[in-house]
């Protein structure tokens, strides 16, 4: 796995170096040489970050760890962007493009169950629940790779032109409910405009990708991610006499089935892929009392804006109609988190 990570990191460097070199002849061996030297450090950084993960908008120690290293390279470092974001700037003092490299820093509320010396033992509170914290999505690797890229490109400074902006983004998984954060907030705070960035390059590791390869394509590449919350309201009653109330648990279960019907029967999957998943459902406080309300929360993934709008309308219609048909009501809220990751065809080619 580490070899896969480091190969991807090396290839990512190769993507941007041609934009920054006055002449491209011989840059591959030079990058390979420097990447090989930094490999032990990348492994060390990744294991440290993996052992001490932090949730979205709570990446305080991670940001401090990253900023301290970037400052040791002599880079201009900015902290506190979008709460915990870190930006470092490498100026070659020669005219050329401004190219950004980006990595995400946050972990997930997941208990790590592997027996490794650098396994996470961290715990935190998420939405009122005590949870384990784990880098289950590879962001520890992304951060370590970008730290390595910063070192390699700093060592190549005299050979480059233009400027490199290293962006370490918090809250890629989405800011906690009621908070702002992530890429949108970084952009709003001027991380691109203030630095006059011409292009941004990023990557995401994938355990399904063959070791030693990298996959990319022009256009829509990674799906938009939206969050939805559905509150089903019925009528509370005793579990022994359900006919005297309106059971929101049963209504919610039918809505969940209906959401899957949207994807499997109302979406033309030969033209566009889509996913609707419910990740949380909560209601009631006692086993023998039918609750008044059930709340569910989930995610919507699409690769095209038109499909995104259609699914939003379908979810509203499905939830409210099913609830009404069973004597209940459903309130639907949909939050657009991140748009489709769109690769500029010119930069991709």
Which role fits each region the language model picked out?
Residues 1-10:
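Bacterial N-terminal signal peptides that target proteins for export
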Residues 9-22:
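Bacterial N-terminal signal peptides
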Residues 24, 72, 253-349:
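Metal-dependent amide/peptide-bond hydrolase catalytic core
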Residues 24-134, 144-161:
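Acidic/His- and Gly-rich active-site-bordering loop/insert found
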Residues 36-40, 53-64, 136, 140, ...:
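Soluble non-cytosolic domains of exported or imported proteins
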Residues 46, 78, 98-102, 135, ...:
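Structural recognition of the beta-strand scaffold that forms the well-ordered cores
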Residues 123-134, 140-141, 152-153, 158-280, ...:
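Histidine/acidic-residue-rich, glycine-tolerant segments that coordinate divalent metal ions
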């Amino acid at each position: 796995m580490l070899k896969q990570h480091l190969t991807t990191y090396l290839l990512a460097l190769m993507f941007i170096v041609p934009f920054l070199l006055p002449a491209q002849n011989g840059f591959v061996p030079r990058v390979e040489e420097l990447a090989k030297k930094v490999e032990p450090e990348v492994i060390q950084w990744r294991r440290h970050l993996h052992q001490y993960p932090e949730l979205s908008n709570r990446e305080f120690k991670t940001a401090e760890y990253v900023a301290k290293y970037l400052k040791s390279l002599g880079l201009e470092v900015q902290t506190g962007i979008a709460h915990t974001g870190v930006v470092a700037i490498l100026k070659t003092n020669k005219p050329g493009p401004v190219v950004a490299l980006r990595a995400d820093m946050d972990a997930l509320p997941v208990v790590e169950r592997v027996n490794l010396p650098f396994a996470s033992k961290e715990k935190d509170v998420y939405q009122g629940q005590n949870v384990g914290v784990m880098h289950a999505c590879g962001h520890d690797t992304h951060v370590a790779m970008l730290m390595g890229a910063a070192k390699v490109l700093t060592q190549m400074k005299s050979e480059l032109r233009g400027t490199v902006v290293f962006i370490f983004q918090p809250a890629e998984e989405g800011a906690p409910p009621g908070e702002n954060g992530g890429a949108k907030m970084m952009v709003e705070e001027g991380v691109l405009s203030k630095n006059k960035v011409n292009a941004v390059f990023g990557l995401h590791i994938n355990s399904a990708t063959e070791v030693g390869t990298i996959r990319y394509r022009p256009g829509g590449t990674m799906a938009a991610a939206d969050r939805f919350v559905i509150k089903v309201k019925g009528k509370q009653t005793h579990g022994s006499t359900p006919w005297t109330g309106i059971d929101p648990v049963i209504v919610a279960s039918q809505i969940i089935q209906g959401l899957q019907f949207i994807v499997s029967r109302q979406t033309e999957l030969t033209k566009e892929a889509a996913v609707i998943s419910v990740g949380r459902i909560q209601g009631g406080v006692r086993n023998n009392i039918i609750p008044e309300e059930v709340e569910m929360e989930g995610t919507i993934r699409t690769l095209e804006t038109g499909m995104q709008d259609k699914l939003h309308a379908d979810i509203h219609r499905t939830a409210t109609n099913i609830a009404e048909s069973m004597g209940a009501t459903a309130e639907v809220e949909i939050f657009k988190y991140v748009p489709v990751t769109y690769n500029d065809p010119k930069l991709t080619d």
